[in-house]
Regions:
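Cyclophilin-like peptidyl-prolyl cis-trans isomerases
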Residues: 25-274
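Bacterial N-terminal signal peptides that target proteins for export
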Residues: 1-11
């Protein structure tokens, strides 16, 4: 079987590669005429071609810098994480700022590396009360309801309406509440740039980018709820069994296929932007 398959593979490859100049010219003309779609861009190409207006300056206070031990050749290793802006995961990111202020992670370790899933770090002795590192006393405890953010909690800069009012609109014999946006032209332009509504997926009614962050949406009008979604490079909070939601002392980063089943089961607090 091997002696048969190898020549066949070579013949097939040759048939694909050795196209005549006329065939290549015809394909180029078809693409130029719009009859065929160009090849999708690679992530690096998308970044390289992004216009200046698509970039946003990250506030320094939203950056979490983690320096690891040098590698085997003595090369420094640094990971830079951007924390999520309010109102998303606000309690957990607040805890992380307190943990950084207390230098909680200094000298701790990466405790878990699972290929195509996550890398997790924190206090390896956290479950041993005699050896566990003390946590700051004023850390918040968040309920599971904080995994989602209601539309009323969204700050104006993340909502496409400059002013949001609740109006009672008659519908048949009943009334219902609906959001009535009154955006200025400036806000409309900003919303068009920041908000990228996409299709439905298996885990949410809609998914979109809002202010550059990947979010899922469920519900409409004043009942709408938003939550961050697990994508490559997103940083989340390790926790114990429900209803525990974690403090932020144990963190992980997604390093493989997006584990979307973790959405609204674990808090997301940021994303790796370098390292």
């Amino acid at each position: 079987m091997r002696t048969i398959h190898r020549p066949l593979a070579a013949l097939i490859a040759g048939a694909l590669i050795l196209q005549s100049p006329a065939a290549l010219a015809q394909a180029s003309a078809a693409q130029a005429a719009g009859r065929t779609k160009p090849s999708p861009l690679a992530p690096g190409e998308i970044v390289a071609q992004a216009p200046e207006g698509d970039w946003a300056e990250i506030p320094p206070e939203d950056l979490l810098v983690m320096d690891l031990e040098p590698d085997a050749k003595g090369k420094p290793r640094r990971v830079v994480i951007q924390l999520m802006p309010a109102p998303f995961s606000k309690g957990w990111t607040g805890n992380i700022r307190k943990l950084v202020g207390a230098r909680f992670w200094d000298g701790l370790s990466i405790n878990r590396v699972q290929d195509n899933y996550v890398v997790q770090w924190g206090d390896g002795n956290a479950e041993d009360k005699a050896k566990a590192r003390a946590l700051p006393a004023d850390l918040e405890v968040m309920p599971e309801s904080q995994y989602e953010t209601g539309v009323k909690m969204l700050e104006e800069e993340y909502f496409f309406a400059g002013e949001v009012v609740f109006a009672e609109t008659p519908k048949t014999a009943k009334y219902r509440k609906q959001l009535t946006p009154k955006p200025s032209k400036e806000v409309q332009a900003r919303a068009k740039r920041l908000s990228r509504v996409q299709e439905r997926d298996s885990y949410a009614e809609y998914v979109q980018f809002l202010g550059g962050w990947p979010l899922a949406v469920e519900g409409k009008y004043d009942k709408a709820k938003f939550w961050p979604v697990h994508c490559y490079g997103m940083v989340g909070v390790g926790r114990d069994l429900s209803p525990n939601t974690g403090t932020g002392a144990e963190l992980y980063v997604v390093i493989g296929h997006a584990p979307r089943h973790l959405d609204r089961n674990i808090a997301l607090v940021g994303r790796v932007i370098e390292g």
